[in-house]
A protein has these predicted regions:
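Extended glycan-interaction surfaces of carbohydrate-active proteins
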Residues: 1-37, 59-110, 115-119, 123-132, ...
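Intrinsically disordered, low-complexity regions enriched in serine, threonine, proline
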Residues: 138-140
Length: 143
């Protein structure tokens, strides 16, 4: 994972955001350049968080969240020169990546020592049955 992060940083970072791929090779057959891909940038947030680079994860997350428009929507790409969203808009893939990155950060911020069936705060999750099946006061521990 660390090698992949280093390769992404070396070859795909552009103005601090992540390109989906480099168009310089012409492999896609399309004219023109691409801009940094919002989902890829959120994926880097998650990778930073999971690899212990939490400060960098938070910094990039803050930058990316600052790109949303006035109603909180994201597009497919971001043009750092024009400072505007470009490409498909709104882009659900970008929003899904935002949620995934936020979850990755919440895991490291909370220490994520959670056992299955517990919430991030350590409490019992709603999907675990702790109610008794009878009046004996013993828990069934599940269904």
């Amino acid at each position: 994972v660390l090698g992949t992060i280093a390769a992404v940083e070396e070859d795909l970072l552009h103005n601090g955001l992540v390109m989906r791929y480099r168009t310089r090779s012409g492999v896609d057959g399309l004219e023109g350049d691409e801009h940094p891909f919002v989902a890829c940038s959120f994926w880097l947030v998650a990778a930073y968080a999971k690899s212990g680079r939490v400060k960098e994860a938070h910094a990039l997350m803050s930058r990316l969240v600052g790109l949303v428009n006035d109603v909180g929507l994201l597009s497919e790409e971001y043009d750092p020169t024009a400072k505007r969203m470009v490409g498909n808009f709104p882009q659900a893939f970008s929003h899904l990546a935002l949620v995934s990155a936020a979850f990755a950060l919440s895991e490291v911020d909370d220490g994520d020592d959670n056992e299955p069936g517990t919430t991030m705060s350590g409490g019992q999750s709603d999907d675990v049955d702790t109610e008794s099946d009878d009046d004996s006061g013993t828990s069934s521990g599940g269904r």
